[in-house]
Amino acid sequence: MSEDIYQNLKQLGGETRIPASPEEAELERVANPQADVAYNVRFTAPEFTSLCPMTGQPDFAHLVIDYVPGPWLVESKSLKLFLTSFRNHGAFHEDCTISIARRLVDFLDPQWLRIGGYWYPRGGIPIDVFWQSGTIPEGVWIPDQGVPPYRGRG
């Protein structure tokens, strides 16, 4: 495999800072060297954090992102920094979850992408947000996201 696909990466292997906002965060991508194969890639962020836009209090979620790559793969450090940039970003759970998915779809042009946002309770109610870009490509194994429904201490 040629190292040329990595030459434009600016964040991996270097010193980086956490972006101040999702808008400032720079996602990076590399050409998919297995673009002729349909396969699933999963990223799990069990400690995702954002802020309530009304109270400024922290909100926490377990995010699971599955995608079937097209021509591009997301570079994982840039994804981590993008997700971390939400820690000082005020938005409702639904907006955070869908904004992440749409940004990835626009940037990567995947064959398919889905996101599950499993938000921990605020005010006693957990909010789960699910979205996918279309029908799962035929022949691709997409495992269950593996996040059980919230049960509290029960």
UniProtKB/Swiss-Prot annotation:
* Pathway it works in: tRNA modification; tRNA-queuosine biosynthesis
Q: Which residues participate in substrate binding?
A: V74, E75, S76, H93, E94
Enzyme class name = oxidoreductase
Molecular function in Gene Ontology: preQ1 synthase activity
Keywords recorded for this protein, A-Z:
Cytoplasm, NADP, Oxidoreductase, Queuosine biosynthesis
* Record localization: Cytoplasm
Keyword DNA damage appears in the UniProt entry: no
CC per GO annotation: cytoplasm
Q: Which Pfam families match?
A: QueF
UniProt KW Plastid keyword: no
Q: What is its EC number?
A: 1.7.1.13
Q: What is its main location?
A: cytoplasm
Say which family it is in: Belongs to the GTP cyclohydrolase I family. QueF type 1 subfamily.
Entry function = Catalyzes the NADPH-dependent reduction of 7-cyano-7-deazaguanine (preQ0) to 7-aminomethyl-7-deazaguanine (preQ1).
Its recorded name reads NADPH-dependent 7-cyano-7-deazaguanine reductase
By which gene is this protein encoded? queF
